[in-house]
Curated annotation (Swiss-Prot):
A zinc finger (CR-type) spans 133-211. The J domain is necessary and sufficient to stimulate DnaK ATPase activity. Zinc center 1 plays an important role in the autonomous, DnaK-independent chaperone activity of DnaJ. Zinc center 2 is essential for interaction with DnaK and for DnaJ activity. Its cofactor is Zn(2+). This is Chaperone protein DnaJ. It comes from Pseudomonas fluorescens (strain SBW25). InterPro entries: DnaJ, DnaJ_C, DnaJ_domain, DnaJ_domain_CS, HSP40/DnaJ_pept-bd, HSP_DnaJ_Cys-rich_dom, HSP_DnaJ_Cys-rich_dom_sf, J_dom_sf. The keyword Metal-binding applies.
Length: 374
C-alpha cells in the first residue's frame, strides 16, 4: 500500500510552521496512543503513521528533502537520494512532545511509574463573586487508584510480571533498513509489565473513574481566563507515579449593569433631558452600594464621569480601579397633552437664539458651507 502524504497524515498545510506541526502531532498522539487504546490495531497503526510523519517533518533537512522528492527523498528503501533518518533515536525526537502528558520527557514514555494527567475544570462565577472572592465546592470526574489492587491492576495475591518482550523497558527497537527506531512495546503497550491475573474491579487498569468533591478558594479580583492550580488533584499516576494537577479556569458571567475591563468597571446611566439640561444629583449603583453623583447642567449624551476606587482590586495586588459612568440622555416618550404644550412653548422660546445648542448650530452651518462649495 502506498504511503499517505505526511502533511495529510498530520492534517496540516505544506507551509505550516513548526509549532503547527507539533500541535497537530500532539493531538493525534494523544488520541491514538497505545496506552489509551490497548486493543485497537487501527489506533496503533495511526499512532505509528503520525510518529513517522512528525519525525520527518520536524527535521528541517528531512522536511526539505521530502518537500522536493516526496517519500523517496527520506526513505532509503525507496531508492531516493535523500538524507534518510540516519539512526536517530526515536525517543530523543519525541521526548519533548510527550513531556507534558506522560510524566516529564523521555523517562515517562518508558515502562514504570508515569505521572497522572492534569485536569481542567471551568468555574462559572458572577461578577460579585469574582470581585470579592468566594469559596465554591466543585464535583470533578477523575481517575483514582483502584483500592482492591492498590493501583497495581493485578488481582489481590498476584503481581504483574516483567514483560519478556521489552525486558520491562516499555520500548522495543525495530530495525528498518539502515536505521533503527524505538517504538512502544506491542505486548505491554509501554507499561513494561504484564498482568496475567487482572483485578476484577479495574480490569487490570489500576485506576477507576470516580467523582471528587473539592473546595476551591477563589481569591478576590479574579477575571475570566485566570487559573487556580490545585496540586495533586488531577488523575492518579500509573504504577505508583505521582498524581496530576487540577486547573480551575475562571469564567465570569456577563453582568446586567456593569462591564469590566481589567480593574475598571463601566456602566451606562440613563438620565432625563431635564436633568441633563438643569443638572441634578443621581444615585449610582456600585458593587459596594449606592453613591451620589452630581450631574452639572448642560450635560450631553456620552459624557463620562469617574467614581474613583469603585472598580476592582486586581488579584495580583495594587489599588482598586474606578467606576466609569457614561451618561445617556433619554428622550421622553408617551407625552400627554399638557407636556406637549410645554415643550412646544420651550421650542418657541429657543427660536433665533443659537447659543443654547452650539453643536446643532455648528453642524448645520457646516452643512450650508458644504453645499455652498459644490
Amino acid at each position: 500500500m502506498a504511503k499517505r502524504d505526511y502533511y495529510e497524515v498530520l492534517g496540516v498545510e505544506r507551509g505550516s510552521s513548526e509549532a503547527d506541526l507539533k500541535k497537530a502531532y500532539r493531538r493525534l498522539a494523544m488520541k491514538h496512543h497505545p496506552d489509551r487504546n490497548p486493543d485497537s490495531k487501527e489506533s496503533e497503526e495511526m499512532f505509528k503513521e503520525a510518529n513517522e510523519a512528525y519525525e520527518c517533518l520536524s527535521d528541517p533537512n528531512k522536511r526539505a528533502a521530502y518537500d522536493q522528492y516526496g517519500h523517496a527523498g527520506v526513505d532509503p528503501s525507496m531508492g531516493g537520494g535523500g538524507a534518510g533518518f540516519g539512526g536517530q533515536n526515536f525517543s530523543d525526537i519525541f521526548g519533548d512532545v510527550f513531556s507534558d502528558f506522560f510524566g516529564g520527557g523521555r523517562g515517562g514514555q518508558r515502562g514504570g511509574a508515569q505521572r497522572g494527567s492534569d485536569l481542567r475544570y471551568t468555574l462559572e462565577l458572577n461578577l460579585e463573586e469574582a470581585v470579592r472572592g468566594t469559596s465554591v465546592n466543585i464535583r470533578v470526574p477523575t481517575l483514582v487508584n483502584c483500592k482492591p489492587c492498590d493501583g497495581s491492576g493485578a488481582k489481590k495475591g498476584s503481581s504483574p510480571i516483567t514483560c519478556p518482550t521489552c525486558g520491562g523497558i516499555g520500548q522495543v527497537r525495530m530495525q528498518q533498513g539502515f536505521f533503527s527506531v524505538q517504538q512502544t512495546c506491542p505486548r505491554c503497550h509501554g507499561q513494561g509489565k504484564i498482568i496475567s491475573d487482572p483485578c476484577d474491579s479495574c480490569h487490570g487498569e489500576g485506576r477507576v473513574e470516580e467523582y471528587k468533591t473539592l473546595s476551591v478558594k477563589v481569591p478576590a479580583g479574579v477575571d475570566t481566563g485566570d487559573r487556580i492550580r490545585l496540586s495533586g488533584e488531577g488523575e492518579a499516576g500509573t504504577q505508583g507515579g505521582p498524581t496530576g494537577d487540577l486547573y480551575v479556569v475562571i469564567n465570569v458571567r456577563e453582568h446586567s449593569i456593569f462591564q469590566r475591563d481589567g480593574k475598571h468597571l463601566f456602566c451606562e446611566v440613563p438620565i432625563s433631558f431635564v436633568d441633563a439640561a438643569l443638572g441634578g444629583e443621581l444615585e449610582i449603583p456600585t458593587l459596594d452600594g449606592r453613591v451620589k453623583l452630581k450631574i452639572p447642567e448642560g450635560t450631553q449624551t456620552g459624557k463620562q464621569f469617574r467614581i474613583r476606587g469603585k472598580g476592582v482590586a486586581p488579584v495580583r495586588g495594587g489599588g482598586a480601579g474606578d467606576l466609569m459612568c457614561r451618561v445617556a440622555v433619554e428622550t421622553p416618550v408617551n407625552l400627554g397633552r399638557r407636556q406637549r404644550e410645554l415643550l412646544e412653548e420651550f421650542r418657541s422660546s429657543l427660536e433665533g437664539d443659537d447659543s443654547h445648542s452650539p453643536k446643532t448650530t455648528g453642524f448645520f452651518d457646516g452643512v450650508k458651507r458644504f453645499f455652498g462649495d459644490l
